[in-house]
Regions:
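Conserved alpha/beta enzyme-core scaffold
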Residues: 1-319
Length: 319
């Protein structure tokens, strides 16, 4: 059949199309608009999936040859290496892992290289997971939901990752509403969910995507995996962040007494389990408000701990 866009006719060979997800892990069937434009790009890897659409569902098909966005691996800082050690110490053989993007994921992936029979069920598949599969740390043999394959909603990383994923039967992709469903996540035992944050306040609220209304990333599946991991038998959820960041040459604490007005919470305090910085790892579940505050202050950079204690008293969080 053929489709036309702007007078250009594009021919295809099959009536049924096997589709990758879009940038948010969504499939064609989730869109209800009148116009559904499919893009064919030879640089996109073929990703194994059972989610297909009939050609009649598409308004038109466009061919293009755009290079994919490549995100380089960053060398983890000593702080991130310390964080990865704390997380690895809490990880058992056979754990089913979920990680995000960036240097935290690289560090955690390196820290898991002494673990065996790991599984993967993650919103995003990245380079650190690819390395664990290549090394044999990931076998997916202990997964009970989608066993035998590393499952995800989308890929993001380097060119090496895209080339490795192309026609790779070790991988399986599914729409994000299914991949990120906490009840599906919990079908695997010993889920290890590792997500990052920009800031966390003294009661355990997490901000991971925005500061004072400025959006730095999408919300993604953080809350889904935080909940799904804790519903999993033996599962653990980690919010990991370095204790500080530097802006314009000045050091700031990532553990704050309160968020600035206009900052929106990504994960509520009632859902947060483990919090990790380079100074330690604490489990906030079942802690009183005072215990939470003291536990989180212990994770802060030493230069800010006294100030945080004073602010906690000022706000009525400590006597």
């Amino acid at each position: 059949g053929a489709s036309t866009l702007g007078g250009r006719k594009i021919w295809i060979d099959e009536d049924v199309l096997r589709l990758n997800t879009d940038g948010r892990g969504r499939y064609l069937g989730e869109f209800q608009g009148e116009d559904r434009i499919l893009v064919v790009n030879k640089n996109i890897p073929y990703m194994r999936s059972d989610y297909m659409a009939h050609i009649s569902d598409a308004t038109c098909i466009v061919e293009m040859d755009e290079p994919l966005v490549s995100i380089p691996n960053l060398e983890p800082s000593p702080a991130l290496e310390a964080i990865s050690t704390f997380i690895a110490d809490q990880t058992c053989d056979g754990a089913c892992i979920q990680m995000g993007i960036g240097d935290l994921s690289t560090a955690v992936g390196f820290g898991l290289r002494n673990k065996n029979d790991l599984g993967i069920h993650s919103e995003m598949m990245g380079d650190s997971m690819m390395e664990l599969v290549k090394r044999g740390n990931v076998t997916n043999t202990r997964k009970t939901y989608l066993p035998g394959v590393s499952s995800a909603a989308f890929l993001m990383g380097t060119k090496d990752l895209y080339e490795w994923a192309d026609w790779n039967d070790q991988l399986y992709f599914l729409p994000s509403p299914i991949c990120n469903n906490p009840l599906n996540i919990a079908k695997n035992d010993n889920v290890l969910s590792v997500n990052t944050a920009l800031e966390i306040d003294l009661v355990g609220q997490v901000v991971a995507d925005n500061i004072v209304g400025t959006q730095y990333s999408s919300i993604g599946g953080q809350l889904d995996f935080v909940q799904g991991a804790q519903l999993s038998k033996g599962g653990k959820s980690f919010i990991a962040l370095t204790s500080t960041h530097t802006k314009n040459g000045q050091l700031y604490s990532n553990i704050v007494p309160r968020f600035q007005t206009g900052t929106f919470v990504t994960t509520p305090r009632s859902c947060v389990q483990y919090v990790v910085t380079e100074y330690g790892c604490v489990n906030l579940k079942l802690l009183t408000m005072r215990e939470r505050v003291l536990a989180l202050i212990s994770l802060a950079h030493p230069s800010f701990r006294e100030q945080l204690r004073d602010q906690a008293k000022e706000f009525g969080l400590l006597p």
